[in-house]
């Protein structure tokens, strides 16, 4: 009986895993828009057998009422099974800072094509990635920007100041080996604050990595408080 339960459980897990793997694949976790170019592109792939209706758009950051100054072509199209396409992102005006990066959100919604049946639920899959506009001629690079970060403790908070013109996204930020929860990113020429791990005393050693333009991580950086 136990072996039967294990077999059934394994089969259910494999079914769930297949569903997770199915669907439209967006070619990146972020898109860096080079201000020196007229457009940027993002690949969309459909490894499924069924077609999807793809809808895409760009949002401003939460709390920003201004319309995002980017358009996507094509904004709505059918993507058949086994096919791929490119989303072309084009800047459409907007008074963006020339001395630092600007952050927006690129949304891709994939709606599967299914036969119309009673009592069926159609589920759309939405993917949201960072769209970072990088003005032409910014000084330095991400690696140099990391070296300019200034860390300090403020009560039970960890503060980091970023004087560089780049958005820096943290990965695996730790204090004395304990993960710093909620440590996401710090905007250019700004300060971010995160909760310190429970029980962390005065001082300590920090370690972290930065997510690069391609969504990967590089070397581990260290600092002391």
Tell me what each language-model feature is.
Residues 17-19:
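N-terminal signal peptide c-region/cleavage motif recognized by signal peptidases
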Residues 22-43, 141-150:
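Beta-sheet-dominated interaction scaffolds and their linkers
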Residues 67-96, 177-203:
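Intrinsically disordered, low-complexity Pro/Gly/Ser/Thr-rich segments with frequent PxxP/GP/PP motifs
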Residues 40-46, 89, 104-108, 158-162:
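Buried hydrophobic-core signal for structured, non-transmembrane domains
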Residues 1-8:
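Bacterial N-terminal signal peptides that target proteins for export
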Residues 94-138, 144-146, 202-225:
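Terminal connector regions
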Residues 152-225:
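Intrinsically disordered, low-complexity segments enriched in serine, threonine, and glycine
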Residues 47-65, 163-180:
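Short acidic, flexible loop segments centered on an aromatic residue
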């Amino acid at each position: 009986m136990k072996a039967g339960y294990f077999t059934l459980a394994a089969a259910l897990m494999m079914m769930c895993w297949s569903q997770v793997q199915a669907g439209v694949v967006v070619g990146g976790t972020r898109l860096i828009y080079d201000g020196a170019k007229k457009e940027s592109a993002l690949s969309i792939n459909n490894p499924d057998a069924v077609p999807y209706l793809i809808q895409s758009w760009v949002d401003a950051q939460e709390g920003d009422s201004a319309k995002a100054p980017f358009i996507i072509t094509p904004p709505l199209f059918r993507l058949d099974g086994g096919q791929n396409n490119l989303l072309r992102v084009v800047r459409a005006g907007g008074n963006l800072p020339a001395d630092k990066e600007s952050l927006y959100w690129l949304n891709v919604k994939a709606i599967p094509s299914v036969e119309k049946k009673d009592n069926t639920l159609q589920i759309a899959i939405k993917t949201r990635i960072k769209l970072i506009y990088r003005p032409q001629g910014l000084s330095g690079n991400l690696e140099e920007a990391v070296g300019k970060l200034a860390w300090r403790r403020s009560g039970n908070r960890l503060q980091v100041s970023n004087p560089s013109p780049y958005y820096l996204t943290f990965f695996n930020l730790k204090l004395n080996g304990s993960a710093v929860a909620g440590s996401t990113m710090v905007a250019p020429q700004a300060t971010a604050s995160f909760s310190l791990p429970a029980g962390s005393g005065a001082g300590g050693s920090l370690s972290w990595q930065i997510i690069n333009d391609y969504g990967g991580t590089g070397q581990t950086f260290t600092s002391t408080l």
